[in-house]
Amino acid sequence: MYLSKYIRRCDFMDNMNTMDFNQKIDVSLRASLEATPVERNASDDLSTGSSSDGFWNLIVLYTGSPQTLQNEFPSSSFTFLLGNYAIVKISEDDIPSLAAFPQVIYIERPRQLFFEIVSARQASCLSAIQENSSYGLTGKGILISVIDSGIDYAHPDFCNPDKTTRLVALWDQTILADPSAGRFAPAGYSQGTLFSPEQINAALQADTFEQRMELVPSTDVTGHGTHVAGIAAGNGRASGGLYRGIAPESSLLAVKLGSPDPKGFPNTIELMQAVDFSVRYAIEHTVPLVINLSFGNTYGSHSGTSLLETYLDYVSNLGRINIVVGLSLIHISEP
């Protein structure tokens, strides 16, 4: 049986090498087809698209009528997409004929997709370093302040193994202070409500979502702040440790930015107050601080002389503080 497979493979490769359609087949597919079964099975990348029954799932760009393509290869199954693209499940033996068919422009093997948090950790070699506990690069003893759209404080990644919160403070600038309900703005500030770890833990013990919201009614409507916090400091409890952030043992401080206009975005006043609160907390508790700012705009001269910029320069020199600004600049004027 093995000999017959070997002979068929040699015949297949002879067809691949003698016909002039190689330019229609992408390089990675050709590499997979030229690999031995042992080599292909040993590689997740080379085997992507192939199945144990000798069929391949491939991406095809074609011209003309879809029906013509289907009629030419009746034993293959096609899913026709917009723009003359198609997904085909085809026998490996028929791939040379598919590539030789004039109506076919190009054939490509599918590629695996990964969660970016995993590939980013792999690219930085962070997992290997963190597994060596002697380095201590887990964020332990570090405070990360996420100034954003809020945080899902009940998410398992932001809780300790005993299900208590990792948050040292949650300042929701959108919730009006209500002293009668035990809700106060942070000392020195007039906006929003500051929730302590004790209040958050009480909310986490609530039996229902409604009861939890009565105690700590802070939510992250867009999910952006939760996403950012997960990348920075998620401990992976929700995924059994599979998807962890960069500093899974750090403490967290979250500020949900408010806005003078309920229908608008926060402005730099709310941002500066959030930074100020975070820095003061870190200095008071003598902990190293990392502030993540994923809010911003392209306004100003970019000279570093606006009051916001000079303020950030100033506070970044207080204590052990690192401010990280991450933006996707989608509105860039042309010269």
What is each PLM-predicted segment?
Residues L271-A282, L293, L308, N317:
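Hydrophobic, small-residue-rich alpha-helical packing segments that form membrane-like cores
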Residues L82-K89, S294-S301, L312:
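Conserved short loop/turn motifs at secondary-structure junctions
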Residues S328-P335:
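Residue-level detector of conserved catalytic or cofactor/ligand-binding positions
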Residues M1-A86, D93-S133:
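Autoinhibitory N-terminal propeptides
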Residues S316-L318, S333:
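Secreted peptidase-domain scaffold signal
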Residues N132-I269, T286:
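Subtilisin-like serine protease catalytic core
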Residues S97-I107, G136-A154, Y311, N322:
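Hydrophobic or amphipathic alpha-helical targeting/insertion segments
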